[in-house]
Amino acid sequence: MSAPVIPKTQKGVIFETSGGPLMYKDIPVPVPADDEILVNVKFSGVCHTDLHAWKGDWPLDTKLPLVGGHEGAGVVVAKGKNVDTFEIGDYAGIKWINKACYTCEFCQVAAEPNCPNATMSGYTHDGSFQQYATANAVQAAHIPKNCDLAEIAPILCAGITVYKALKTAAILAGQWVAVTGAGGGLGTLAVQYAKAMGYRVLAIDTGADKEKMCKDLGAEVFIDFAKTKDLVKDVQEATKGGPHAVINVSVSEFAVNQSIEYVRTLGTVVLVGLPAGAVCKSPIFQQVARSIQIKGSYVGNRADSQEAIEFFSRGLVKSPIIIIGLSELEKVYKLMEEGKIAGRYVLDTSK
């Protein structure tokens, strides 16, 4: 294969200050380091984390100026001299974890998302809201050629994240799992992964469009939190005692704390969504007496990533996506803040 022609400049969305103007403009194409690949990003999903990165409202500093995005799917067009795991023309994915140290106590047990020296795409390393982006070749995801690059983009964060959360819940096939925020980008994927893993799914969200989507994707029960008079009672009745696990992907502190009330005795509450400044509160007596576990789950490691991608490549999981141009990113953030997104927005970097 002849070497692709790589331009000196590209289109991207960049901001210079937290919460500052989102500028769609010409920016330089990065040069891959010795251990990196350069990916011609065709499509990028938009995650709630990207909104936080722009606002700068997490207790973790971003680099500035910053190109956000960490769900980038594209084609390898260049690679550093030490890279032997990718070839030019391969499909590759840019994930949240861009690079880890691979030597700390966490990396040694394959918990590289917890590496204190990790760099994050679209946060501390320029991400996928540009036409060309770099990623460490060890962390970059290998995407099978049978995959649609637009549809697989959300799998690279949302899919991996909810798949890992379901593994963290450690429940058995046939048991109940509740998903809060089930109609959003993470939630719609959580419903599908849970179904594919053999669980019975109860979806919690609001709105007729989200109810239809969740049920079409495999949810057995949908509870509209805005309509129910007693959500805790309704959830426990529908699952005959409460779900064995709850996957909290909503960005609601109230939803998190409410899930501790309705989860089944001996059940597990998994925290995934990160509402700014939120606190998880659990009555200690009830948590001890009912033997409830509360666990955090933070993206996934390389094995989790490839497993999540395999579910997609086998057709067991689909991405309910809406494709718009990269230049329209600010519109997506506005809809995200208003809670009006069903499924996932994906940006076409050519527009």
Swiss-Prot record:
User: Under which EC number(s) is this enzyme classified?
Assistant: 1.1.1.1
Q: How does activity depend on pH?
A: Optimum pH is 9.5 for the oxidation reaction, and 6.5 for the reduction reaction.
Enzyme kind, highest EC tier = oxidoreductase
The record's remark on the cofactor is:
Binds 2 Zn(2+) ions per subunit.
Residues given in the record as NAD(+) binding sites? 181-187, 205, 210, 272-274, 344
Give me the residues that bind Zn(2+) 2, please.
101, 104, 107, 115
As its record notes, the protein acts as a catalyst of: a secondary alcohol + NAD(+) = a ketone + NADH + H(+)
Temperature section of the record? Optimum temperature is 28-33 degrees Celsius. Active from 22 to 37 degrees Celsius.
CDD domains tied to this protein = CAD3
UniProt KW keywords = Metal-binding, NAD, Oxidoreductase, Zinc
One MF term from GO for this chain? alcohol dehydrogenase (NAD+) activity
Source superkingdom: Eukaryota
As cofactor, the record names:
Zn(2+)
Q: What do the Gene Ontology cellular component annotations say? A: cytoplasm
| Family per record | Belongs to the zinc-containing alcohol dehydrogenase family.
Q: What does this protein do?
A: Versatile oxidoreductase that catalyzes the oxidation and reduction of a broad range of substrates. Preferentially oxidizes secondary alcohols. Has highest activity for racemic 2-octanol. Is also an efficient reductase for selected substrates. Substrate selectivity was found for medium chain lipophilic ketones. Has highest activities for 2-octanone, 2-nonanone and 2-decanone. The enzyme is (S)-selective in the reduction direction and produces exclusively the (S)-enantiomer.
Q: What is this protein called?
A: Alcohol dehydrogenase 2
Chain's gene name? ADH2
